[in-house]
């Protein structure tokens, strides 16, 4: 299994039939009858261990070049890489790379890859094999998912990690590793979901692994993956093979199966092309000219899978699509959006009535799909204050909260009942609240604002001449009172919807903001003027407030961990905030 904690494998790989998802056999015996390794094997093992120290021991850092992977420099020894890899041998002959620290060459991983991707952890596993001849187990944090009942033997993160290793082995010209990973990918093909076979087929095509291509093409041709998904995710040459094989299988199973209506298919594809062009007006025109409906074209599914969130908003605004409609594979638009892992589209669909409890034909909910696609590294990643939270984590949080609550009630407009003076005060309060949310929880605030169609200026104290709402309150001599009142009410409703969305999907963040605004914000206003001593008190108090935000988040996170549920991760680390005890002002 990918996360098994076992020793590294032996120096000989190709003869070992015992392949697992994360490591291979490490028996040093030359035959079953020998109980003691030979002196030669012991010497090679010691050499391997000594070379490994060059990678793992900080005291043995004698590297002479850096390869930057995902923004992280990895020190390497060019002589070792050149002796083991024809790719690096030719690279170091041809160029010296850009100058780094102490004039050592620096290379960027993305410059090496004509296709595919090789992540930081995958490169470290590859590098360890180059140095030691031993293949390490796959790191748990990048080769498993966060679904609590998954065996991790063929989930998407497990497959993706081996795919990355295959790209590294093929591009860097390590044929023995290619053979190992090809067998491992072949093992995946029979166990994985059909959608998860697509990345395997793609790497097989790029690396010209014919046996693996044939196995994948056969598996995909027998699946229910639609032609559009294939055309979007695979090269034309491969798609053509799949379609031919699929037609043959269909004719064998049902010779009387009527062919698809080409005119009907053409009209549907025209609607999809209009969505690709972000032209919803053209979509409306095509619907008028033909007898095709949005649901027949699965337009909402298509937009959720491939289009900008603004296009999804416009399609929903037409009011012609069933938000819980299932496509031919039994997926709703929410299931498709979850596979894409786009939080804004997920929240859009939920606010329009999409049911998170809907199950696919194989019994998976939206949150189950999302968890099977998410790596522990991404789910548990820590985010500094002011940085955006990980999208995978936000998607899971939103869906789990939706599963635990009643569907959100419709937006009842109460802004029309607010008097003019109260309207300005309410606008000021909401503008400042949303601005504070952007400061403390930027990713969550941005998501709520996008759905509510709200934009706000940065937070400013009431001493500002224009207020925190910027030009919103300014008097326009060309604007009639009626128009101004309509504009302010529209703004108020957008801000109120932003706050409601925050309370609905990010309740812990909202609680922190409530406490900050009720208990602490007035004190900051009173301290705005004053002597230097008062300014020092204000700065000290602000640091204490930052600590309270962290403590509140840690408390929520601990409670969620105990119950197996998750909370928002957009905050800063306690080490960078300061003391652990909050001092109340007298």
From Swiss-Prot:
Major localisation? cytoplasm
| CDD domains for this protein | BTB_POZ_NPR_plant
In residue numbers, the region (Disordered) covers: 561-586
Functional description taken from the UniProt entry: Salicylic acid (SA)-binding substrate-specific adapter of an E3 ubiquitin-protein ligase complex (CUL3-RBX1-BTB) which mediates the ubiquitination and subsequent proteasomal degradation of target proteins.
Q: Where is the BTB domain?
A: 63-139
Q: Which family does it belong to?
A: Belongs to the plant 'ANKYRIN-BTB/POZ' family. 'NPR1-like' subfamily.
Instruction: Please name the source species.
Output: Malus hupehensis
Q: In which tissues is it expressed?
A: Highly expressed in leaves. Expressed at low levels in roots and stems.
Which residues participate in Zn(2+) binding? 145, 150, 152, 155
Induction section of the entry: Induced by salicylic acid (SA) in roots, stems and leaves. Induced by jasmonate in roots. Induced by ethylene in roots and leaves. Induced by salt stress, osmotic shock, cold stress and abscisic acid (ABA).
What are the BP-aspect GO terms? defense response; defense response to bacterium; defense response to fungus; regulation of jasmonic acid mediated signaling pathway; regulation of salicylic acid mediated signaling pathway; response to salt stress; response to water deprivation; systemic acquired resistance, salicylic acid mediated signaling pathway
Q: Where is this region: Salicylic acid-binding core (SBC)?
A: 388-522
Task: Give the metabolic or biological pathway.
Answer: Protein modification; protein ubiquitination
Q: Does the keyword Transcription regulation apply?
A: no
Compartments where found: Cytoplasm; Nucleus; Nucleus, Nuclear body
Protein name listed in UniProt: BTB/POZ domain and ankyrin repeat-containing protein NPR1
Q: Which PROSITE patterns match?
A: ANK_REP_REGION (PS50297), ANK_REPEAT (PS50088), BTB (PS50097), ZF_C2HC_NPR (PS52046)
Which residues fall in a compositionally biased region of kind Low complexity?
Answer: 562-573
What does the record's free text say on domains? The BTB/POZ domain mediates the interaction with some component of ubiquitin ligase complexes.
């Amino acid at each position: 299994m990918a996360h098994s904690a076992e020793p590294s494998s032996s120096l000989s790989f190709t003869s070992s039939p015992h392949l697992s998802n994360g490591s291979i056999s490490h028996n040093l015996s030359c035959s079953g009858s020998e109980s003691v390794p030979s002196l030669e094997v012991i010497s090679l093992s010691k050499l391997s261990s000594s070379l490994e120290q060059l990678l793992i021991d900080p005291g043995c850092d004698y590297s002479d070049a850096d390869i930057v992977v995902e923004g992280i420099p990895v020190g390497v020894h060019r002589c070792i890489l050149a002796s083991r890899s024809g790719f690096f041998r030719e690279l170091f002959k041809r160029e010296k790379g850009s100058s780094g620290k102490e004039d050592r060459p620096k290379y960027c991983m993305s410059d090496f890859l004509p296709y595919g991707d090789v992540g930081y952890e995958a490169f470290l596993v590859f590098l360890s094999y180059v140095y030691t001849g031993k293949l390490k187990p796959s790191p748990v944090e990048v080769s498993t998912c966060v679904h609590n009942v998954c065996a991790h033997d063929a989930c998407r993160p497990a497959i993706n990690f081996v795919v990355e290793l295959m790209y590294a082995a093929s591009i860097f010209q390590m044929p023995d590793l290619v053979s190992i990973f090809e067998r491992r990918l072949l093992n995946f093909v029979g166990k994985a979901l059909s959608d998860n076979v697509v990345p395997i087929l793609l790497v097989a095509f790029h690396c010209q692994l014919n046996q693996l291509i044939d196995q994948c093409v056969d598996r995909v041709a027998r699946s229910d993956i639609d032609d559009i998904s294939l055309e979007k995710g695979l090269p034309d040459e491969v798609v053509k093979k799949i379609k031919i094989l699929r037609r043959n299988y269909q004719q064998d199973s049902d010779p009387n199966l009527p062919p698809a209506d080409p005119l009907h298919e053409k009209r549907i594809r025209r609607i999809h092309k209009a969505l690709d062009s972000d032209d919803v007006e053209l979509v409306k025109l095509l619907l008028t000219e033909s007898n095709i409906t949005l649901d027949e074209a699965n337009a909402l599914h298509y937009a959720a899978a491939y289009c900008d969130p603004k296009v999804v908003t416009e399609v929903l605004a037409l009011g012609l699509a069933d938000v819980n409609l299932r496509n031919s594979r039994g997926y709703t638009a929410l299931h498709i959006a979850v596979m894409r892992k786009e939080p804004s589209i997920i929240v859009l669909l939920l606010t329009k009535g999409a049911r998170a409890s809907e199950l696919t034909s194989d019994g998976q909910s939206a949150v189950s799909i999302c968890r099977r696609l998410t790596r522990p590294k991404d789910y548990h990643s820590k985010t500094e204050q002011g940085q955006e939270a990980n999208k995978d984590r936000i998607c899971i949080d939103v869906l789990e909260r939706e599963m635990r609550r009643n569907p959100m009630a419709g937006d009842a407009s109460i802004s029309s009942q607010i008097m003019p003076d109260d309207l300005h005060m309410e606008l000021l309060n909401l503008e400042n609240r949303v601005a504070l949310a952007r400061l403390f929880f930027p990713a969550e605030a941005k998501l709520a604002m996008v759905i509510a169609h709200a934009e706000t200026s940065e937070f400013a104290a009431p001493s500002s001449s224009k207020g925190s709402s910027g030009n919103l309150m300014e008097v326009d001599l060309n604007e009639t009172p009626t128009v101004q009142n309509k504009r302010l009410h529209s703004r108020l409703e957008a801000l109120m919807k932003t706050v409601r969305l925050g309370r609905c999907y990010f309740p812990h963040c909202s609680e922190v903001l409530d406490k900050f605004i009720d208990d602490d914000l007035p004190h900051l206003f009173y301290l705005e003027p004053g002597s230097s001593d008062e300014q020092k008190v204000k700065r000290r108090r602000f640091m204490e407030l930052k600590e309270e935000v962290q403590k509140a988040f840690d408390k929520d996170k601990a409670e969620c961990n105990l119950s197996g549920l998750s909370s928002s991760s957009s905050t800063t680390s306690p080490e960078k905030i300061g003391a652990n005890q909050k001092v109340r002002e007298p």
